[in-house]
Design a protein with these regions (language model features):
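Acidic catalytic/metal-coordinating carboxylates
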Residues: 36-37, 63-66, 86
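Conserved acidic segment of CheY-like receiver
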Residues: 5-17, 21-25, 53
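Active-site beta3 strand of CheY-like receiver
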Residues: 48-54, 59
């Protein structure tokens, strides 16, 4: 059985940011799926569950926090917020709402990759815990 390559979803309305993030994330071997808006993301069927969602706070249709609230059924999905504003109150709100990390653009590549790795580890731990609980019930 071959290992499953993690997939990261990226939601950002800026094409240059999306393309840069896609190249960076692919460079370390992860798969990437990009979305141009919250509406685009919400409308897309997702048969694959990502290890992480990299989410721009400032989107044209919904802000990142509003999108996060719409994902109530997927609270376990780790979210890394990115913002072009040095908006500390927004970062604090994002973290209180359950974000794994909040980064201000421009951020270092290794900061984003480390945030995604942390999110992936969180996803793996939660999956392992769920499997352990399931096995214990049998």
């Amino acid at each position: 059985m071959s290992p499953v390559t993690p997939i990261v979803f990226v939601v950002d309305d800026d094409i240059s940011v999306r393309e840069s993030l896609e190249l960076l994330i692919r460079s370390v071997g992860w798969r990437v799926e990009t979305f141009t808006s919250a509406t685009d993301f919400l409308a897309h069927p997702r048969p694959t569950v990502p290890c992480c969602l990299v989410l721009d706070v400032s989107l044209p249709d919904l802000n990142g926090l509003e999108l996060q609230q719409r994902l109530d059924d997927r609270r376990e999905l780790p979210i890394v917020f990115i913002t072009g504003h040095g908006d500390i109150p927004m970062s604090v709100r994002a973290m209180k709402a359950g974000a794994t990390e909040s980064l201000t653009k421009p951020f270092r590549d290794d900061a984003l990759l480390n945030a995604i790795r942390s999110a992936e580890l969180k996803t793996l731990r939660e999956s392992y815990a769920a499997l352990s609980r399931s096995a214990a019930r049998r």
